[in-house]
Curated annotation (Swiss-Prot):
Interacts with MinD and FtsZ. The lineage of its organism: Bacteria, Pseudomonadati, Pseudomonadota, Gammaproteobacteria, Enterobacterales. Keywords: Cell cycle, Cell division, Septation. GO terms for biological process: cell morphogenesis; division septum assembly; regulation of cell division; regulation of cell septum assembly. Cell division inhibitor that blocks the formation of polar Z ring septums. Rapidly oscillates between the poles of the cell to destabilize FtsZ filaments that have formed before they mature into polar Z rings. Prevents FtsZ polymerization. Belongs to the MinC family. This is Probable septum site-determining protein MinC. Residues 110-119 have a biased composition (Pro residues). Pfam families: MinC_C, MinC_N.
Length: 232
């Protein structure tokens, strides 16, 4: 047992991000309820981050907050806020204002070219799972790809910030690009997933085209939706 009453440790959690493109609270509520109805087991009472980068007009945060809360979603934070008054309103509501990892503070250009890092530092590790992934298990591969060389049961969940490869029957949920990488892909030799997701865009099993169900397939993210093709 630790001698200290508390301990702070770094960790990573996968959260869905709700990108708002309309400031009307009723429109937001209805759109969210429609999404939740498509995947209630995945989204009902889910913790989410709300991105309001597309909202440039003056809005009342309280009304938007109440509309989202009415759907059962739980707001863990708000990102992309560019309006000072709105930032103050969100902060007073006790909701954290988040800065997305891809945002970087501007800095002057270096006077000389920066030498490339050593080759070893450019290598991205891959998490490899050889055992079957059983129902109820959740496997997360932060900042790398995930490869499973066995079957994935229904009720199991694979999450990776990079690509996901499954060399076996894929019956569970696969969430690639969990950190927002829209170039991530999913590769399966036998696709029968409950849910597939890339950077927050997802399909339920009913959305998977029948001609690909149970077959070898490759999924990627198009301009605004998932796309699928045979895995050769």
């Amino acid at each position: 047992m630790s001698n200290t009453p508390i301990e702070l440790k770094g960790s990573s959690f996968t959260l869905s991000v709700v990108h708002l493109h309309d400031a009307n609270p009723e429109v937001i509520r209805q759109a969210l309820e429609d999404k939740i109805a498509q995947a209630p087991a995945f989204l009902r009472h889910a913790p989410v981050v709300v991105n309001i980068a597309s909202i440039e007009e003056e809005v009342e945060w309280r009304a938007i907050n109440e509309a989202i809360a009415a759907t059962g979603l739980r707001i863990m934070g708000v990102s992309g806020c560019k309006i000072p008054r709105l930032k103050t309103e969100i902060d007073r509501a006790g909701i954290p204002l988040l800065t997305e990892g891809k945002e970087k503070a501007s800095r002057p250009a270096p006077s000389e070219p920066t030498p490339p890092p050593p080759v070893a530092s450019q290598i991205t590790k891959t998490r490899l799972i050889d055992q079957p992934v059983r129902s109820g298990q959740r496997i997360y591969a932060p900042h790398c790809d995930l490869i499973v060389t066995n079957h994935v049961s229904a009720g199991a969940e694979l999450i990776a910030d990079g690509n996901i490869h499954v060399y076996g029957m894929m019956r569970g949920r696969a969430l690639a690009g969990a950190g927002g990488d829209r170039d991530a892909q999913i590769f399966c030799t036998h696709l029968a997933a409950e849910l597939v997701s890339i950077a927050g865009e997802y399909w339920l099993s009913d959305n998977i085209p029948a001609e690909f169900y149970g077959k070898a397939a490759r999924l990627r993210l198009g301009e605004s939706a998932l796309a699928i093709q045979p895995l050769n």
